Regions:
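Active-site helical microenvironments for divalent-metal-assisted chemistry
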Residues: 1-177
Length: 177
């Protein structure tokens, strides 16, 4: 399950970059080279699976919001350095929505790895977020291309999301929605 979460988180990271109009100045291979570079950096930065998963999910958001001065105070230096290395990336369109930073950040840097796991699973268990990314036919084609290159498909991806949702429902206390 942990390997599936990491794989799903990394794939969502790549999809988030592509579907919100962030591109590299080079060709598609350059994009995947950069993605692999991000993966290797995160692996070297932290052996903690939960931190790596959460970092994947936040990279596109951090890159978008980094110009907000207060936001810099929420992230450790290694994440900010990694984002600075993504400087060649350019945003050509605005994202359709914003992640609720306070709640996400609290979970991401919680002292409890379980809290991070649960929050990550909650993030991954929102199929509507994933489906919104592929609503536009052009985006769907780009996403499918990315997933194909990473040897997975939409049905497999949604299956992982559903598994994460089931995991979260087992952890949640009765009465908490």
């Amino acid at each position: 399950m942990e390997n599936q979460l990491l794989h799903t988180a990394s794939t969502i990271c790549h999809i988030a970059f592509a579907s919100t109009g962030i591109t590299t100045p080079s060709d598609e291979q350059g994009f995947f080279d950069l993605s692999d570079s991000i993966h290797n950096r995160l692996r070297a930065i932290s052996p903690d699976l939960h931190v790596r998963c959460a970092s994947y999910l936040f990279l596109p958001v951090i890159h978008t919001e980094l110009k907000t001065g207060d936001l810099k105070n929420h992230f450790p230096a290694y994440i900010l350095q990694l984002v600075q290395e993504l400087a060649p990336l350019k945003r050509t369109t605005c994202p359709s929505g914003k992640i609720r930073f306070d709640k996400e950040l609290e979970a991401m840097f919680s002292a409890s790895p379980d809290a991070v796991s649960i929050r990550l699973a909650e993030y991954l268990s929102g199929p509507s977020r994933f489906l919104r990314m592929i609503k536009n036919p052009d985006r769907k084609a780009r996403v499918e291309k990315i997933l194909t290159a990473r040897k997975c498909n939409l049905s497999h991806q949604l299956s992982l999301l559903m598994q994460a949702e089931e995991t979260v429902s087992r952890f949640k206390s009765p009465g908490i929605t």
